[in-house]
Amino acid sequence: MKTYSRISTLLALFLTLALVPSALAQQQNQKNFPWMNTSLSPDERADLVVKQMTLDEKINMVHGQGMLGWANKTFPNMHLGNGGAGFVLAIERLGIPSLQISDAAYGVRSSAQNGRYSTALPSNLASAASWDTEGACEYGALIGRELRAQGFNMTLGGGVNITREPRNGRTFEYMGEDPILAGTLVGHRIKCEQGQKVIGHIKHYALNDQESGRNEVNVKIGKREMRETDLLAFEIGITIGNPGAVMCSYNAVNGDFACENKYLLNDVLKNNWKFPGFVTSDWGGTHSTEKSSAAGLDMEQPEDLFYGPKLKEAVEAGRVPMAQLDDHVRRVLRSMFATGIVDDPPQRSMIDVEAGFETSRKLAENSIVLLKNSNAILPLDRNKVRSIAIIGHNADMGMISGGGSAQVDPPGPPPKWLQHVWFPTSPLKAVKAKAANAKVQFDSGSDPAKAAALAKQSDVAIVFVHQWTSEGEDLPSLSLPDKQDALIQQVAAANPRTIVVLETGTAVTMPWLDKVSGVLEAWYAGSKGADAVANILFGDVNPTAKLPMTFPRSEADLPHPTVRTPPPGAKDIALRMKAQDEPTYSIEYDEGLKVGYKWYDAEKKPVLFPFGFGLS
């Protein structure tokens, strides 16, 4: 038995050693490929690869290989993915690695289901409130590092749709209502993200300014109005950040779906702006083969309904020119070479959790906006305040985060789609740590009378309220949900020394504003949001952030007082399973150039808090 075991071991060792020269030779051959010459430009290197590719290799380069749970399908190559949003096959014989793609709006998504960890940063809207390009750079660099540490080489972050509709469920993913501010900050985020050797990304191109009817709606807008508002943010972001990829959106614009819209993709993006990278569809946002290819869509995600066998057949039949397919492929390869993911593929490594926490806290401190400070209630004097009431749902446990494909997983099991997720950053604990000599008590606010009683017997009441928003749905109104306005009213009536901390993804109305002494807008504050809030409350950090969007008095003052939803009988379904030539219904952005503060100024409408407002 021992002899047999020894022989087996020696045989295995012999076979392993026999394979080593072959593997080393293959690696050496790949290094000698002419496109591995780093002195060549990304364009030159990409051109050399394209000339060596077969038709099947080219087709595989322009579509995804599936996503776990997508459309209840199984995909044969899923074992080659990295557990993210999707992937593109490697071309191993030519030394080209796979694209491993992850959502990463405010941190790397889906880490829990893959046994990993990701830092949750403050939301993109919070980042915009900092008005800080260096902070935006830190934001992108951290996400880039954590993407690579988890084995990803492409991000799906970089949202920059401007705030035309503040009830949009994805407002928290974007950079506010001003195209110059939004484009500048997203550009610096992307630039520093790509500095970590991942493909950066900007989305959703274009005019995906609401979630209601996003797969069905046709946006009507003039070309000048489009170019000087929504597209301007993209133009600035692309100029500064030079992202490797642009994601086209679900909606149609002036009659053509964005992912087959020649004006958006070829005329403006590639020809006018000279964008050298590639355009990928939003997930399930491709509607055709020949029209999409001719319009400038380079990649279908996350599967191959239109850019797999159908595209191959169209090329072979001459309906899609080979030169057109080559351009799609070359653009993908160019971005891979330009960002360094071919020369230096990511290697999985441990994430520096403490460094992530430190960055998240610092960015949150720079993003919290002080909206009201009557009688200088802030900063709180820890030597004078003897009793503090902490009131609010889950304020003893954590702070709310934004949902959908942006959702960063907290420690523990992966959350379900559209589940409300609270990060374990406890306001109660953070305040207790700052006010060690005070009596700090908690009430959930589920019984407003009980919460008011606690507030009445306390020197100060701090009410933490939240507004959950997510991809896939818009808010019915800008009011706080779950009767939280009434809770604040009752607490403030019991103790006018009430401070409200808003955890929101967009603007909110404040019928109680004149009854409270202080208001902080903390947005979705990330992994260390509670510490950041406490540092502001007690004066360890001076708030410097300014609003990146207008807070209106009510929905009646908006350009469109009601969210425009699909008409009766029209379902807002994902069109990933079929082609569709026409969107179901249209909305007209008749406010034109008057977006955000320009609307309120031109229409002489008073606001609750103007764009750019923030106290110190």
Regions found by a protein language model. Name each.
Residues 1-2, 20, 206:
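Intervening/peripheral non-core polypeptide segments
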Residues 1-11:
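Bacterial N-terminal signal peptides that target proteins for export
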